[in-house]
Amino acid sequence: MEPLVLGLDLGTSGVRIAVLDTAGHLLHSSSTSYARGLAHAEDWCRACRELITGIPQTLSNRLRALAVDGTSGTLLACRTDGTPIGRALPYSRACPDQSHLLQALVPATSPAASSSGSLARALELLKRVPEPGFLRHQADWINGWFLQDWRWGEEGNNFRLGWNPQKNEWDGAISNQRWAAALPSIRPSGTVLGRIDNDLAIELNLPTRISVVAGTTDSNAAVLAANPCEADGVTVLGTTLVMKRFTAQPLVGPGITSHRVGGRWLCGGASNAGAGVLRRFFSDDQLRELSRQIDPESASGLDYLPLPDTGERFPVDDPGLMPVLEPRPVSDALFLQGLLEGLATIEARGWQRLRELGAEPPLRVISLGGGARNPQWRRLRERRLGCPVLSCTMPPAAGVARLALQALNEGESAQQH
């Protein structure tokens, strides 16, 4: 029987999985929400367990590899056996009180130098738990759960913790710190970390020979799902707004990520703003109905900065930046248009920021996430960005599954030679 691969996408509000065949066709996809929220690591594996056990047995019996992506920057302190110590600090949690310590640890040009980065959250966790066994990002912790071995970390997920993918070492003085033993052993995206734990495989009704492959971040997985060409930019319109594109060289700057994916540099940034702020005011049904009342060819006249809370990481890195959500007009449709225009402005500034750092401007933008299905928002973005905007319906879970498929194909090729 043809082998299959599994991708698991751990997002802000829940988990989605995707099963692909060797041709990359999507055979199965399902999702569920976290019971309590992103900060609860137990909910991560509970959601994964629920979705995996729901895969039809005719498919699950053929699985040979899996890969996980997670929210970039959500960090957890845990014991060496993986037991969480308190709650995780979500990616959106800035820790400005750690700024002075960051300056002593890493250069100002390091992606880890920002108080909105993972290193700042690590220092905050170390203040609460001075002797953790491990500090692990969301995807790395779930990989540990599958393996029952929490040693490993994938390089992209640890970028803003201070891992330098160009030098293959921790930035600055990080490795000299007393707590450096809590950091993961880094492996490149697409590397086979080991086989799924035998007892867990049986519990999940999975084959015991499944390989666990180092995945990537949730935003990188979305890009892989879009399968862009060199001239394309990719925007993920999820709870947060993520802009990525392939570049000839890595880009460097606060709030900027440069990851190696498929042998190429994938660079970009993620705003704290996104569709999450829309759901604060409207249900999905209301968003659909109100969007139909919007004329995207006419401006609302509103000038919003729709951040969910104080603080931004990209296109500007400012932990003190305040949201602007007023004045609110009487018309809900006009209010929604103002919010969508504000998000489009953030996106335009994001692409401009990447251009300032050396990236070519995208000739078109491929959109993913729930917001990509909104035609009025698409047109508002086209007007603001000045280029065509297309949609991709493949979920990020399918993107990270491509890494599992790549590892599976490389393993078979090596066996043939």
Listing of model-derived features with the role each one plays in the protein:
Residues M1-R87, E131-F134, P184, I202, ...:
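N-terminal glycine/serine-rich phosphate-binding loop of ATP-dependent small-molecule kinases
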Residues L6-G7, Q103-A112, G117, L123-H137, ...:
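Active-site core segments that coordinate phosphate-bearing ligands/cofactors
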Residues T32-S33, Y91, A248, N272:
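A generic structural motif
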Residues Q57-S92, T109-S116, A139, N143-Q166, ...:
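Short beta-strand-loop/turn "lid" adjacent to the catalytic site in phosphate-handling enzymes
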Residues A77-D81, H100-Q103, F246:
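Short, conserved acidic/polar surface loops in the N-terminal third of protein domains
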Residues L89-P107:
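Short alpha-helix plus adjacent loop in nuclease-associated cores
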Residues T191-V192:
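Glycine-rich, mobile lid/loop segments that gate access to catalytic sites or pores
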